């Protein structure tokens, strides 16, 4: 089974399926066309436009007014990656690094970043073959994108840095040679496209969200079993109670409890006590608030992982290259 990277909305549930089932990925034909079209547009634009383009024909940050000679553009992008690969601290877990690769590929696939198709395809190769760059947890604020962790993630594209492959930490150039992969020669804009972005924080966010959803499911299961064992009442879980308050998660929790306890002889039998303790009666309100929070976080993260987040942003159809702040 193969998941095709495309403009189709990528859900957190689909991300979970890809990771848990070790599903391979590939670029859809439409994604390939968008990537190639954007790169060709950028190359043509650089031949005809005399005005400087930030980070493409200029330096970075405070050096934005310094023009870069054409024969130095590739070296500029390579230098950018190497200079920012300064992460420290504990290593990022392998499953998070793999998720970072997936999200970076998705972000680059929209055709607004100006990268070479070859560059994105190599990231796909890394993902599919579990060639996972060594990335560190500290070194970046995220205020200008996840610069340091993404730089460490992208070093192996150049044959630099280290990767984890088959359980061993190895120099990336050795592993590239085993696969017959040549180091990528970055073209103008590519270093920025790879480093600018939110895939490090998004990967941790998505991973945490997947865990939170699972914990929420378990909380309902444990709560239902506890209510049944306590010989509790199902009355606090009827729809009428929760429809008048209209919090979605609260109603969802109540219905889930009734579903889980359907057919239970204990829950259906007459009760001697008038009401249950707070800890049982308020489960829909407490679990429901958690569900609503998880849903909100999910909506934010899904918007983020379905967006290009580098800078400058390229719009080939409108003949626009704009320096903005979607990396923040």
Write out the residue ranges for each language-model feature.
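FAD-binding glycine-rich core of flavoenzymes that anchor FAD
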Residues: 112-138
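Accessory "access/gating" subregions that flank catalytic or transport cores
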Residues: 227-328
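Hydrophobic alpha-helical scaffolding
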Residues: 5, 28-31, 66, 86, ...
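Alpha/propeptide regions of enzymes that mature by internal proteolysis
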Residues: 91, 114-115, 217, 299-300, ...
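Short alpha-helical scaffolding segments that buttress acidic/His motifs in well-ordered protein cores
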Residues: 15, 80, 84, 96, ...
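N- or domain-start disorder-to-order transition segments that initiate the globular core
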Residues: 1-50
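Mobile "lid/hinge" segments at catalytic clefts and subdomain interfaces of large enzymes
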Residues: 149-257, 262
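FAD-binding core of FAD-dependent oxidoreductases
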Residues: 54-68, 72-76, 83-108, 136-158, ...
């Amino acid at each position: 089974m193969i998941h095709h990277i495309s403009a189709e909305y990528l859900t957190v549930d689909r991300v979970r399926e890809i990771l848990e089932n070790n599903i391979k990925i590939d670029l859809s034909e439409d994604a390939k066309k968008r990537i190639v079209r954007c790169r060709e547009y950028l190359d043509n634009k650089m031949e005809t436009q005399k005005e400087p383009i930030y980070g493409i024909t200029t330096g970075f940050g405070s050096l934005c007014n310094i023009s870069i000679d054409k024969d130095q553009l590739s070296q500029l992008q390579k230098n950018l990656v190497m200079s920012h690969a300064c992460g420290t601290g504990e290593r990022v877990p392998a499953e998070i690094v793999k998720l970072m690769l997936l999200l970076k590929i998705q972000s680059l696939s929209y055709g607004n970043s100006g990268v070479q198709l070859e560059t994105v395809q190599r990231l796909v190769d890394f993902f599919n073959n579990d060639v996972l760059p060594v990335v560190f947890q500290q070194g970046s604020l995220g205020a200008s994108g996840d610069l340091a962790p993404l730089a460490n993630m992208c070093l192996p594209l150049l044959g630099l840095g280290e990767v984890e492959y088959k359980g061993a930490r190895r120099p990336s150039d050795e592993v590239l040679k085993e696969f017959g992969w040549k180091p990528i020669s970055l073209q103008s804009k590519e270093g920025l496209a790879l480093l600018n972005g939110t895939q490090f924080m998004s990967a941790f966010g998505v991973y945490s969200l997947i865990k939170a959803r699972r914990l929420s499911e378990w909380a309902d299961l444990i709560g239902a079993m506890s209510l049944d064992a306590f010989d509790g009442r199902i009355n606090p879980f009827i729809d009428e109670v929760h429809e008048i308050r209209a919090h979605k998660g609260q109603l969802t929790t109540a219905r889930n409890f009734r579903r889980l306890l359907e057919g239970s002889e204990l829950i259906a039998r007459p009760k001697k006590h008038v009401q249950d303790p707070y800890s049982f009666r308020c489960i829909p309100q407490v679990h429901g608030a958690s569900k609503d929070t998880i849903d909100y976080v999910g909506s934010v993260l899904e918007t983020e992982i379905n967006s290009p987040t580098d800078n400058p942003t390229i719009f080939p159809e409108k003949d626009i290259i704009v320096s903005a702040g979607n990396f923040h």
